[in-house]
Amino acid sequence: MLTSEEMAVVDANAAALGVSRKQLMESSGNAVARVVREVADAGDSVALVCGRGNNGGDAFVAARFLSAFDVTVHLLGREATVSADIARENWAALEAADIDAREVRDSESLALEDPDVVVDAMLGTGATGALREPEATAARAINDGGATVVSVDVPSGVDADTGEAAGVAVEADRVVTFHDAKPGLAALDAPVTVADIGIPAAAERVVERGDLLRLSRDPTAHKGDFGEVLVVGGGPYAGAPALAGRATLRTGADLVSVACPAAVADTVQGYDEGLIVEALSGERIGPDQIGRAHV
């Protein structure tokens, strides 16, 4: 199970390992289309309601794999506002293929026209907080209809990490998420499909452009159970001990002290509020000061 932040790390690591975001979007879209085919009958109408990010891009791809259905794609916004280059490429592919792709330029102009299936691809795992417009109005329209609703990655309006909604949220009948389950999906009253989209296992354990492998912690642990580290340095410069201390926090130690000259103590503290800064007398570190520093 991966949190939204951890999933972003895995995506970045996969790209560094040679699996491009474009490849992942193609695989994700194909996975969405497979779930739609499971819930729809041949000839059914399918409306894909899409955001302007990668989540919407997944649905643009899915639309190309749904030629057996009466498909309409509703982009919540203008084409020019689509944030990702690969998503814009897939929007252009829809237009080139003469698939019914519409720009929804204000929340009142969304017309779903009573489809049999709705694909909710407005917002993905990285979104938090209450839905804004036009997504809020679109979510209400989806919920008020009688269609089977398939959400991409997570129902829009639901926090992927907590399962909570800060306001209106899409009421999904099915959810298709990618690579691994997300913590917030366990609370949903809907079947969840976890689709393998070709992310290598090394993306979870290799340090690349994303981040270090996530750390597993006992939720009943106390501060200090995961290491106490003392960083000694500074004077007249603060960068080295401050960066070393911050890096130590990121690797998982939860009590990190930085012993540095008083002249740079405030600067070091400003790098991260999680650092415990011990201000030592003088402008440089010497043997006498080290003896007074402690973890």
Where do the PLM segments sit?
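Short, conserved active-site loop motifs that form the nucleotide-linked donor/cofactor pocket
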Residues: 99-100, 173, 192, 275
